[in-house]
From Swiss-Prot:
Natural source organism: Schizosaccharomyces pombe (strain 972 / ATCC 24843)
GO cellular component, one term: UTP-C complex
This protein's UniProt keywords: Nucleus, Ribonucleoprotein, Ribosome biogenesis, RNA-binding, rRNA processing
Protein name as catalogued: U3 small nucleolar RNA-associated protein 22
Superkingdom of the source species: Eukaryota
Length: 1097
């Protein structure tokens, strides 16, 4: 039950079991069917109010999905009826619990525990045992449904579902002063234990009884009753009854306001400090019945309850709960706040909820209120005009109901509240952008997954001795040493990291519970989890500057906080200040400064080498990435030499003066110039693949009037330019190369220039007159097909690729981590042998979608996290019906998704087999999606990518993932495995150049020549309809193949069979795979070491 027994942090999704995410996914498609019914609805009553008519007629797909979601998370009536019988039995037993006359509290506890069946769950600190504390037991005045149960509508959560019962303790049990020094909580614990013991004696093995810390506050135990009978197991949903002791308002509210002190036993000789957390806990206890009655009043409105169901799902998906070790705002607060906003007086305009709102409007209004700036900057009061309660400004956040004095945000830390508000605002943005399309991002996707949510995440393991602080009660009004340790650690890290992080979250996802014969205080969590959202603007700062020496107090505090790493430094402007300098020998060390700060500060202030024990979740992933991709985390800087060489290449060309036409434009057209190549030129190898550049002359009417003539003129221009470039001091060699020699109307030449900096650039000349001639040929039926191919090739090479390069450059410059993310993504695609089956441009846009498009998470500053999010997108993207839209510069029309969806529907109707556009991707520079994903990937490869992404994501989300397996593809699924003789490949030969000086002059005379790529192209040409080939161009040790399924089966002999076959019987033949392998060997020659045929009979 949200707020009582908190969900565990994505544990079910990590161990492979079914999660709400996978469970909900199965219903989304069915909602789409419902959408078609909405258009068929007719007006039932022409005389209805306009608002009602509009609501009926404009029932959106989003609202239909909400209705379906509510239906899915609601507990069915048959389950409730079965559970209600059990609850009535519990209530009868509670009222029959034996009376215990008033006696000394400690004697009563000892007597209750003497048979060792139960232990009274008392929290520290305990008052001196000679105090005259009295205890007694009489049955509760009432046993009634709690806040979640009073409406008889129950919602599922990750732990199943629950029924909360409020036990109203008679006022005679307490005195007017029992709110002081924890007396109320001790009597409450004794009272609950009496009931627990009676239930144990009467129910025996029928139930499992546990004490659970209410909201993880061990001062406030509640009793969890879990039925063990087969009848409940048959329901398929875990069911729990929670018994929650409560009282009516018996303590004066004025004594329990945030600025008051209510813990005095241990502060007798000290200044009495305010105890806001303790006071708020007491106020919550004595107002639960009041808030239950308020919620029950508004529960007659089904839209109110549905909005609570939506709130429950939204909170669960983000890991928000009422736990003081987590967020501090859960479903209980959601129910109460909704009821208060409907009933409170004196609220500013726009904050009042009206009864005529729909569930969706209730939900959105709640998020708008919770994200309000008023809650962060001021003391927000409800019912202030009807109360004389004087409430002073205390710690924020504060949202106080003046009728009760209860602060609804009292369990939240300010920084957690800021994070909570950011989540509210992010959800509102998703709703405003496209509520229907973003439905799954809001309600279905598990957001609280550290590998997907944070830039840096990990845990701090604690030893038992670190939670044994007998004096913790002198330092805080919190419930336990763990809560104090968590808060102190949070304050330390927040102060130490400062503006290097946008957000820091510390939490525990472990529910504090124990058997009724154990003590809750021995079951405190032994782990603190944390997550950081980094600030890219301050992340790489080397020096943290403190106060000047003139500020003696500030300087002393700075040195005490930082310890031996602090020092006085003089800066270039002449100023002197206390500072901390983080020495870094590489960009990777610089980006890891936050991790170094965490370890240092925890070691210094917590001792016991706590900092050294910190485990960063992505540490091993980062190590693996560095070994495969780059030793640097910020790979953006690795491209600085490439961009400098490009600028030199541009200047060298544009400064030429002896060419007939002046150059109008030079554009980058290569993955190396968009910071996204799988390997940086010259960074990992001694050679450089040619870097493509496109340039264009100013317009001229003297160009030939036919395509072949234009190509010959291009050759003449490039020969002249090559001659001029070779005369420059910074050019080693310039030559004109030919391509497309079998098709003279296509671009057939390029200029390849080797500069003295060893970078090779390949220039291609663009002439837009070619488009006119291609379109003219397209109008002729006899040349239409070839003209369409020629036009596509021209537009792709000279228009799309340069525009794509500029767009990706802009993304990478705005998000420096994009470079690492896209290189990781390419490594993943290549590792699974998908080279040439998915184009680099498609991969780059898949990663760009993580940064450009809205998602369940805010934009990350970590390449590794972005890669994980890309896998999440691929694992859940239904590319059959959902277009991918990349609006990189914001120029696409606002209804682009509607247009793209309609276009995709039309494409799928015309191409049912999905021969083209398996991935339908729209960008602002390719609005029709003709150049991205039109040919590649194919439908089969797209399905393969989805399967690989799901498997990889599942592995990544495990507690101890095997990162190597994510980038390793099994060879068992392939029919043919060709073992490549890697000694024949330049990329492996060149690794020896740095080892042997006599080989350093043997660098390749053909920059960029890749024998394995040419080999695979030749295989595709020879066996196009017989076998599909797969390889990894970054590490081509094997080439694999899969036979076309249609030729594997026996088939009747035909004279037009175009593949090797052997006779099975008189008129039946089958593929002769051995002959195919022999033909492959002949094509590969020395490149092939061996061929393994894995075709099963």
């Amino acid at each position: 039950m949200n707020g009582l027994k908190r969900e565990h942090e994505s544990s079910s999704s990590q161990d492979g079991s079914k999660t709400p995410e996978t469970e909900y996914d199965s219903h989304v498609d069915s909602i789409e069917d419902i959408h078609s019914l909405a258009s068929k609805r007719k007006k039932l009553n022409e005389k209805k109010e306009n608002l009602e008519d509009l609501t009926l007629l404009k029932t959106s797909a989003f609202e239909l999905k909400l209705n379906e979601l509510i239906r899915e998370i609601s507990v069915r009536g048959k389950y409730f009826r079965h559970a209600n019988t059990f609850v009535e039995k519990i209530k009868d037993l509670i009222f029959k619990t034996p009376v215990i006359p008033e006696t000394n509290f400690w004697s009563a506890c000892k007597n209750l525990e003497k048979d060792k069946k139960v232990i009274v769950p008392l929290a520290e600190p305990l008052s001196a045992k000679d105090t005259n504390l009295r205890a007694s037991f009489v049955p509760p005045k009432t046993v009634t449904p709690g806040i979640f149960s009073c409406s008889n509508k129950f919602f599922l959560n990750p732990d199943g579902w629950s029924y909360d019962l409020f036990l109203e303790i008679p006022e005679s049990i307490f005195t007017q002063k029992d709110y002081l020094n924890g007396r109320y909580f001790r009597k409450r614990a004794f009272y609950l234990t009496c009931i627990a013991k009676h239930l144990l004696e009467n129910l025996g093995n029928e139930v499992k009884l546990e004490f659970v810390a209410f909201n993880d506050d061990i001062r406030r135990p509640i009793l969890a009753i879990l039925p063990e009978s087969k009848g409940f197991a048959a329901t398929g949903k875990r069911f729990t009854v929670f018994l929650i002791p409560t009282v009516r308002q018996i303590f004066p509210v004025s004594k329990l306001l945030p600025h008051k002190n209510a813990i005095r036993d241990f502060m007798e000789h000290e200044e009495l400090k305010p105890t806001p957390f303790y006071n708020n806990s007491v106020l919550e206890e004595q107002n639960l019945l009041f808030y239950r009655d308020l919620v029950k009043k508004y529960s007659v409105n089904p839209q109110f309850l549905d909005a609570c169901g939506l709130g429950s799902t939204w909170l669960n998906m983000r890991g928000f709960s009422s736990s003081i070790h987590s967020n501090g705002f859960g479903l209980l607060e959601w129910y109460v706040l909704m009821a208060l906003l409907m009933s409170s007086t004196g609220l500013p305009a726009g904050n009042v909820l009206n009864t005529y709102l729909t569930a969706a409007q209730f939900f959105k209004s709640m998020l708008q209120f919770l994200s309000s700036k008023n809650l962060t900057s001021t003391l927000f009061k409800l019912n202030a005009d009807s109360s004389n309660l004087k409430i002073g400004n205390g710690h924020l956040p504060t949202l106080i109901d003046c009728n009760t004095g209860f602060n609804l945000l009292g369990k939240m830390k300010q920084s957690f509240f800021e994070y909570f508000q950011a989540s509210c605002r992010h959800t509102l943005n998703l709703l405003d952008e496209n509520a229907n399309y973003n439905f799954s991002k809001i309600f279905i996707t598990h957001v609280n997954v550290p590998a997907l949510e944070f830039d840096v995440s990990g845990c701090i393991p604690l030893e038992p001795k670190e939670l044994e602080d007998p004096n913790f009660c002198r330092k805080t009004d919190l419930d336990s040493p763990y809560s104090l340790y968590l808060e102190y650690t949070w304050d330390l890290l927040q102060h130490a990291l400062g503006d290097r992080v946008c957000q820091i979250i510390l939490y525990s996802s472990i529910c504090t519970s124990c058997s009724i014969n154990e003590s809750l205080k021995t079951k405190l969590p032994k782990l603190i989890s944390f997550g950081l959202l980094l600030n890219p603007d301050a992340l790489l700062r080397l020096v943290d500057i403190g106060p000047s020496p003139d500020d003696t107090v500030g300087s002393q505090k700075f040195r005490e906080f930082w310890g031996e790493v602090s020092e006085l430094r003089k800066f270039k402007n002449g100023s002197i200040a206390e500072s901390v300098y983080w020495e870094c020998s590489s960009p990777d060390e610089r980006i890891r400064i936050p991790q170094r700060i965490i370890r240092h500060i925890l070691n210094r202030h917590l001792g016991n080498n706590v900092g050294d024990r910190v485990s960063f979740r992505n540490e091993k992933f980062r190590v693996y990435v560095h070994s495969k991709i780059s030793p640097n985390t910020d790979t953006y800087n690795e491209y600085v030499p490439v961009m400098e060489a490009y600028n030199e290449a541009v200047k060298s060309l544009i400064n030429l003066s002896d060419i007939p036409l002046s150059i109008a434009e030079i554009l980058p057209a290569d993955e190396s110039l968009r910071y996204s190549s799988s390997s940086v030129p010259f960074y990992e190898s001694s050679t450089c693949a040619p870097i493509d550049v496109v340039f264009q002359f100013e317009s001229s009417s003297k160009w030939p009037d036919e395509l072949e003539g234009i190509q010959r003129t291009k050759i003449a221009f490039l020969l002249k330019i090559a001659e001029l470039l070779e005369a420059l001091d910074n050019v080693e060699r310039a030559s004109v190369g030919l391509e497309n020699t079998d098709n003279p109307t296509h671009n057939c030449c390029f200029l390849q220039v080797l500069f003295s900096n060893n970078f090779t650039f390949r220039y291609r000349l663009r002439n837009d007159r070619e488009i006119f001639f291609w379109k003219s040929l397209e109008r002729n039926p006899s040349t239409k097909l070839s003209a369409q191919k020629g036009l596509y090739a021209y537009e792709h090479m000279f228009q799309f690729i340069p525009r794509h390069t500029l767009a990706i450059q802009a993304i990478c410059q705005a998000h420096r981590s994009y470079s690492m993310a896209v290189r990781l993504a390419k490594h993943w695609f290549y590792s699974h042998l998908l080279t040439d089956h998915v184009t680099d441009e498609v991969i780059e846009l898949l990663v760009a979608s993580v940064y450009i498009n809205s998602s369940s998470w805010r934009t990350t500053s970590s390449g590794e996290t972005s890669f994980c999010r890309m896998l999440h997108f691929l694992a859940h993207w239904d590319w059959r019906f959902d277009p991918l839209i990349i609006n990189s510069n914001g120029k696409l029309p606002h209804d682009v998704r509607h247009q793209a969806t309609e276009k995709l529907e039309s494409i799928r109707k015309q191409d049912v087999a999905i021969a083209h556009n398996a991935y339908y991707i729209i960008t602002d520079y390719d609005f029709d999606g003709n150049h991205i994903g039109y040919y590649k990937p194919s439908k089969i490869i797209a399905n393969r990518i989805t399967s690989l992404a799901r498997a990889s994501l599942s592995e990544l989300l495990k507690d101890t993932p095997n990162y190597k397996s994510i980038f390793k593809s099994s060879l068992d699924i392939y029919h043919v495995v060709i073992d490549v003789n890697i000694n024949k490949l330049p990329m492996y030969r060149e690794s020896n150049l740095t080892k042997y000086k006599n080989l350093q002059n043997m660098s390749s005379e053909r920059p960029g020549f890749e024998p394995i790529t040419e080999f695979v192209k030749e295989l595709h040409r020879c066996f196009e309809d017989t076998i599909s080939f797969f390889y990894n161009k970054k590490n081509p040790k094997v080439v694999t193949g899969v036979f076309n399924p249609r030729i594997l089966a026996n088939r009747p002999y035909r004279t037009n069979i175009d593949y090797p076959f052997k006779v099975v019987d008189k008129d039946t033949v089958v593929l002769d795979a051995d002959v195919v392998c022999e033909e492959i060997r002949q094509v590969g020659g020395d490149l092939i070491r061996s061929i393994q045929l894995q075709l099963k009979a």
